[in-house]
């Protein structure tokens, strides 16, 4: 029998995942997103930066698994007026070594009681999970798609060859198969070049004969 647990389920871009860190925040509070934080800012220094507002509840700098800052954090307030005041007064001001960028944090993401089996199934069936855990299946689909395209190209090439054979038959040429078509074309090209070469030689010979005749006349 599957259990029921309280968590925050997030959805975006075809992906479904759990974000248990959002359980630390009271959904009734007003949260600010604090961006462009430097490596020198931690939870305590972020709290000190907003400590002048009495309704300040919590601050947190988001970090990766290795403990490195991800460059942003969150600040929450009980009072909406102080939330707006802090947003207006602190936006663009330096906290640590950088000027921060403030915006309203997403407030429609709230904790819910969900069935463990159901949420696990949704995560597995999301786009992200299909790409990560079923990569072979995705690659197979891509290969099949490319195979279809190749078959179409092959059929088109065969059709073009048949057309060439048909047109050659109309003009009197009767190639035995598609490979004889290029040979017939090459033969015609070679014959044309030979004719052109012979004409050039005849022209050169005529020029020499004319020059000799002219020299005899002068004598």
Swiss-Prot record:
Pfam families in UniProt: RRM_1
GO CC annotation, single: U4/U6 x U5 tri-snRNP complex
Nuclease found in the keyword field: no
Ranges where the RRM domain occurs: 30-107
SUPFAM superfamilies linked to this entry: RNA-binding domain, RBD
Annotated Polar residues bias: 176-186
UniProt xrefs under Gene3D superfamilies: 3.30.70.330
Region named Disordered: 140-219
Compositionally biased residues, Low complexity: 150-169
InterPro entries for the chain: Nucleotide-bd_a/b_plait_sf (IPR012677), RBD_domain_sf (IPR035979), RBM42_RBP45_47-like (IPR050825), RBM42_RRM (IPR034215), RRM_dom (IPR000504)
Domain of life (superkingdom): Eukaryota
Ranges of compositional bias, category Basic residues: 140-149
Alphabetic keyword roster: RNA-binding
GO molecular function annotation: mRNA binding
Keyword Phosphoprotein part of the UniProt annotation: no
Parts forming coiled coils: none
Protein name: Uncharacterized RNA-binding protein C22E12.02
Species this chain originates from: Schizosaccharomyces pombe (strain 972 / ATCC 24843) (Fission yeast)
Organism placement in taxonomy: Eukaryota, Fungi, Dikarya, Ascomycota, Taphrinomycotina
């Amino acid at each position: 029998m599957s259990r029921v647990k309280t968590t925050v389920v997030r959805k975006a871009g075809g992906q479904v995942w759990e974000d248990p860190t959002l359980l630390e925040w009271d959904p009734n509070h007003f949260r600010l997103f604090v961006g462009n934080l430097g490596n020198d800012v931690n939870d305590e220094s972020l709290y000190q930066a907003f400590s002048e507002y009495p309704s300040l509840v919590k601050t947190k700098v988001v970090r990766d698994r290795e403990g490195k800052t991800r460059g942003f954090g969150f600040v929450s307030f009980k009072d909406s007026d102080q939330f707006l005041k802090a947003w207006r007064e602190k936006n663009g001001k330096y906290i640590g070594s950088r000027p921060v960028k403030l915006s309203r944090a997403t407030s429609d993401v709230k904790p819910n009681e969900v069935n463990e089996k159901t949420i696990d199934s949704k995560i597995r069936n999301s786009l992200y999970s299909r790409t990560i855990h079923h990569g072979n299946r995705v690659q197979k689909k891509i290969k099949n798609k490319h195979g279809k395209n190749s078959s179409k190209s092959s059929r088109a090439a065969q059709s073009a060859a048949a057309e060439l054979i048909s047109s050659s038959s109309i003009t009197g040429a009767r190639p035995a198969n598609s490979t004889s078509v290029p040979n017939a074309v090459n033969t015609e090209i070679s014959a044309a070049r030979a004719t052109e070469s012979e004409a050039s030689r005849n022209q050169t010979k005529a020029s020499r004969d004319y020059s000799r005749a002219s020299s005899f006349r002068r004598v």
